[in-house]
Regions:
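Flexible inter-domain linker/hinge segments
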Residues: 1-9
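Solvent-exposed alpha-helices and their adjacent loops that cap or buttress functional pockets
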Residues: 8-12, 22-23, 69-72, 88
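Short beta-strand-loop/turn "lid" adjacent to the catalytic site in phosphate-handling enzymes
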Residues: 42-46, 65-98
Length: 98
């Protein structure tokens, strides 16, 4: 597992965006601030258990965002990758074709 935890630099009320990339072997999550700077990222091999891996990495990202920005936070989420279409339907979030 690899993480980039630089959420200390974001302001309390700035919106954040999360991208989830579901590939053939890994799930990656990245969180961007309103200046398009990466403020959190993580990737994890899913070993064919995509749902559990998504829950894990997204929970890590949401926990970190909540620690820094509090519970009232504007967050948009989009999904991409070879396994992204099914995941976007499961999560009811937009799919972005790579």
């Amino acid at each position: 597992m690899t993480k980039n935890n630089s959420l200390d630099f974001i302001q309390a009320n700035s919106p954040v965006r999360m991208g989830i990339d579901v590939g053939s072997t890994t799930v990656k999550v990245v969180v961007l601030d309103d200046d398009d700077s990466i403020i959190y990222s993580e990737y994890e091999r899913h070993r064919a258990d995509i749902r559990s891996t998504i829950i894990l990495v997204v929970t890590h990202a949401l926990d970190k965002i909540q620690q820094v920005k509090g519970e009232s936070q504007t967050l948009s989420i989009k999904v991409t990758g070879s396994g992204g279409l099914a995941v976007s339907q499961w999560l009811s979030v937009p799919f972005i074709q790579e």
